[in-house]
Amino acid sequence: MTVHALLLRREPSVAGMLAAAAASSACFGAAVGSYTGRFQILYDAVKMPVYLLGTLAISFAAMHVFAARDLRAGETFGAALETVGLTAVVMGALSPLVWLFSASMPVSQQGYRILILLLTGSVAAAGIAGVARLHSRLRSIRLTAAWVLIYQFTGAQMGWLLKPWVSHTARDDRFLPLRQNLEGNFYESVITTILGLFS
């Protein structure tokens, strides 16, 4: 019922939206993990809900600062959770497609690159659906843009801390090498990569 309510823009319960977001994103994570298989399926199924909902939890206070003039805290949380919930549901709907490619793709550098492109496209499509719903709720381009920037800024670092998502080899199925992930951050990595292109 919650998924149906999300799709039809009805008012689902907070518990229902949390459950739908967790279940849908877990399905997507499991599909991603099936590229390497084995424990990576379970790892990614656990990490994907932590990523989406954890990013929301960390971002919420900053989001409400921008929305406090127009929305109460409960309304801010409801709009943000609905956005994340719909994004997760779309990701869940794309899980069979992602699983088909993940399970049949050879574990190689070429297969890895193709899968990363597929995952990027899938997450982008889900994100567009979520942002469209967010804008229809907020009815403010500036507030929508601010929320998206806050969530993406936080989410990029969350994704870095929770990596690996797609393992390079069948032997690389670690759950969370946190000590290694704490060395540097997403933005430092991007800058280093860009500078490396010109050195």
What are the functions of these language-model segments?
Residues 39-114:
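Alpha-helical transmembrane segments with an aromatic anchor "belt"
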Residues 8-19, 41-44, 141-153:
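Alpha-helical transmembrane segments and their helix-start/interface "positive-inside/aromatic belt" motifs
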Residues 34, 65-67, 135:
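Structural signal for the C-terminal ends of transmembrane alpha-helices
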Residues 137-199:
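C-terminal membrane-adjacent module
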Residues 95-144:
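A contiguous pocket-lining binding segment that forms or flanks enzyme active sites
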Residues 30-41:
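Short, hydrophobic transmembrane alpha-helix segments
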Residues 1-18, 23, 178-199:
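N-terminal juxtamembrane cytosolic/stromal segments of multi-pass membrane proteins
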Residues 18-30, 50-58, 85-98, 119-129, ...:
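Hydrophobic alpha-helical transmembrane segments of multi-pass integral membrane proteins
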